[in-house]
């Protein structure tokens, strides 16, 4: 196919997408066709360095050769069987999640895992489990506490604890009995009462603008949950699985329920909800379920991904690259202190706070071969692959700095 035929083909494809896709996303007229490691290519063979990783998903890079091999091999053996039967990979993944978590010092008391297909499903399970535990204690123990700027998903339960009018308003009324506190304010623990069954919080908020929870805040939540018998849920769908340079973003304070997804499948759909023995003991056969969750294909991929993101090599790389990015952004921040006001986050979940809308910077970066995304209000979010190499990082940072310098006066 010659170049002009390809252009016509992909132009037609964009028209097809506009005609047949439910319009839930605003997308640039770029069609991505292949990826390798930290790089992506579009239909015109333009090459991009990916600092978005599919929104913190492709933690081990695009088209990871070992994952590609696993997908081919397992799909030729067994992709799916119902959860009326066991398969050989789901229990292996569940065991590894618990053992690696305990080994890392995360989630004291982690014991059992429910496997699902996505982050929002993992959170739905967490909310249901917390409600079940609560109502066994008291029929009035049904309420939830969440926090400003949180994002927990778009299905009805997860949406109900995502306090953003942009997402919630079209679908009201939502699940009742949800109270919203101020993130990082220990006084928010006062919202937790005898009627509270669950408190859900991100140790590092991603979508809300990349804000890291402090220990005092999380400890206040833990103390009040213990006092009233509520379940503390940590949503680590974006910030977990090595993204902070530790297996889990939480450190000194530990949850009753931990949710994860995104990086666990490196692009293949999977989610998981890990619970303590005390929670698992309250869940009976038939209380919850899933058609595809825990299928052997997703579970085998997840088993491999976990072995890599928990490794010292990958976690050390996260810390090294994080500092490299911070140093580069600090250089530009010195030039434009009124434009770049702060760099937030942890590991390779970083947010560059602009005083003005940075959309021109994002567009300029893309035009010059770097993909970055936004979060919250005027925040550019950087979430590259955890195993990104030095060459790609250096090249990407040069493009980012140029995009900022070239557009600083026009923002």
Curated annotation (Swiss-Prot):
Protein's name according to its UniProt entry: Acetylornithine aminotransferase, mitochondrial
Gene: ARG8
Protein source organism: Yarrowia lipolytica (strain CLIB 122 / E 150)
GO cellular component, one term: mitochondrial matrix
Catalytic activity: N(2)-acetyl-L-ornithine + 2-oxoglutarate = N-acetyl-L-glutamate 5-semialdehyde + L-glutamate
Family annotation (PANTHER family): ACETYLORNITHINE AMINOTRANSFERASE, MITOCHONDRIAL, AMINOTRANSFERASE CLASS III
UniProt GO molecular function: identical protein binding; N2-acetyl-L-ornithine:2-oxoglutarate 5-aminotransferase activity; pyridoxal phosphate binding
InterPro entries linked to this entry: AcOrn/SuccOrn_fam (IPR004636), Aminotrans_3 (IPR005814), Aminotrans_3_PPA_site (IPR049704), Class-III_PLP-dep_AT (IPR050103), PyrdxlP-dep_Trfase (IPR015424), PyrdxlP-dep_Trfase_major (IPR015421), PyrdxlP-dep_Trfase_small (IPR015422)
Broad class of where this protein is predominantly found: mitochondrion
Keyword Oxidoreductase attributed: no
